[in-house]
């Protein structure tokens, strides 16, 4: 239930190579190094091309390279921020006879290919880097095909227009970017661009049913066949314990879950309360367990002798309506022990500021969501009437449901763009 972001890690990913397109995205310690992937894709391109030169192989291709580099230089209206210096330098060299010697052609050729392939990638799937992502798949072969098999007579501008995202919210953001934002307003620009890149990601990873839990909005939505079926408020991680961005799948739902309190919460928050109030454990339905999961008689423990550093036990909260996880837990695959869950503290959903959890996502309408995902196996009456120590049950979903825990600092309502507070300071 707790997640601590590595403060040394960058909030945005660095350039793939010194000449690759940059964008606004978030880092992921679980992603393969981008430089290695880009080198591999470029090499794959030349293997398929059967020629060590592509752009310098003919005047036609040189002209095409100039078109691409011009597009990359001026792609700000698409929310794709490029390394203009590299693009300009190569383009000027291309149109200036004799400025590229034979030995440099191979290097320049690959630089152009890397720039163009990365542009095609960002254009169609965005450059969002979730902290953990098991949904997105490689489309490198598609981008290579698009570059090698351009339609006869189709300009680069026409190709980009054809491949550009057609998502409704994306188009609203794109038009807003074009019409409303001054280049000098870098914060708003970054927020809109981040929103555009998320919409590109969703379009590239289209799913029938899915959940989006957006951290800055502290809201979650469930979509079925692209129709919004449930929208609810959430409580997400605090600034101290931020919720990570995750693209994963809900695999099962637990009814009447136990809460195995993370050790850091146990020693920093619960232990002082137990030492101060002798009946705290009983009043809040906690058991003390050892490392093997065996329940310990807490009345025989010398509580005053324990500190954060030497407390050898764990706390486990019994099932029931007063459990911190409520009566439902939605498990999703990720390395951070993050999940969605109900809660016994409903009052938090009435607040505007809902960045209060240790990292997990509390749902305002968990019963409705569970009923949608497991219509024949969820009895809302039983869940509402559950008592202390009700038996916990894990129910596998017939098919896993994608869930995207996102950091989108803008919201689209109709044709209006709403800017959200950058609660974790990731946009800067």
What does each of the following model-derived ranges do?
Residues 7, 16-17, 49-50, 81, ...:
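Generic alpha-helical secondary structure signal
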Residues 141:
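Conserved catalytic/binding loops enriched for acidic/polar residues
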Residues 32-136:
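Cationic-aromatic interfacial patches
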Residues 1-35:
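Bacterial Sec-dependent N-terminal signal peptides
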Residues 2, 30-38, 43-47, 114-118, ...:
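Well-ordered beta-sheet/strand-loop patches within structured domains
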Residues 9, 18-19, 61, 74, ...:
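A generic structural signal for solvent-exposed, polar alpha-helical segments
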Residues 7-8, 25, 50, 63, ...:
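Alpha-helical structural elements
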């Amino acid at each position: 239930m707790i997640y601590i972001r590595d403060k040394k890690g960058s909030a945005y990913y660095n350039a793939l190579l010194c000449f690759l397109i940059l964008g606004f995205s978030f880092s992921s310690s679980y992603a393969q190094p981008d430089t290695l992937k880009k080198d591999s894709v470029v090499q794959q391109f030349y293997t398929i091309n059967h020629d060590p030169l592509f752009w310098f192989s003919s005047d036609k291709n040189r002209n095409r390279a100039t078109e691409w580099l011009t597009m990359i230089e001026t792609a700000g209206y698409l929310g794709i921020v490029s390394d203009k210096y590299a693009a300009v330098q190569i383009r000027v060299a291309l149109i200036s006879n004799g400025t590229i010697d034979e030995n440099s052609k191979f290097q320049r050729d690959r630089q152009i290919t890397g720039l163009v392939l990365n542009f095609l990638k960002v254009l169609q799937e965005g450059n969002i880097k979730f902290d953990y992502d098991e949904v997105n798949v490689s489309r490198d072969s598609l981008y290579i095909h698009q570059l090698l098999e351009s339609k006869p007579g189709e300009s680069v501008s026409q190709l980009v227009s054809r491949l550009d995202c057609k998502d409704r919210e994306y188009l609203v953001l794109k038009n807003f970017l074009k019409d409303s934002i001054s280049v000098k307003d870098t914060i708003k620009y970054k927020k809109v661009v981040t929103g555009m890149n998320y919409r590109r990601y969703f379009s590239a990873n289209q799913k029938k049913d899915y959940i989006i839990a957006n951290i800055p909005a502290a809201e979650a939505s469930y979509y079925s066949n692209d129709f919004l079926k449930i929208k609810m408020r959430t409580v997400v991680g605090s600034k101290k314990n931020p919720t990570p961005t995750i693209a994963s799948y809900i695999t099962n739902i637990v009814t009447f879950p136990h809460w195995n309190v993370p050790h850091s919460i146990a020693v920093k928050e619960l232990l002082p309360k137990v030492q101060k109030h002798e009946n705290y454990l009983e009043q809040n339905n906690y058991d003390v367990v050892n490392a093997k999961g065996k329940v310990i008689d807490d009345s025989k423990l010398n509580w005053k002798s324990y500190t954060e550093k030497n407390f050898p036990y764990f706390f486990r909260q019994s099932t029931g309506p007063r459990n911190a996880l409520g009566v439902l837990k939605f498990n999703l695959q990720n390395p951070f022990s993050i999940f969605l869950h109900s809660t016994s503290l409903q009052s938090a959903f009435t607040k505007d500021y809902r960045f209060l959890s240790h990292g997990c996502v509390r749902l305002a309408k968990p019963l409705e969501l569970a009923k949608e995902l497991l219509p024949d196996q969820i009895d809302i009456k039983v869940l509402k009437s559950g008592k202390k120590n009700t038996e916990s049950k894990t129910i596998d979903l017939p098919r896993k449901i994608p869930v995207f825990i996102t950091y989108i600092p803008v919201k689209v309502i109709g044709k209006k763009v709403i800017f959200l507070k950058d609660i974790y300071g990731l946009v800067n």
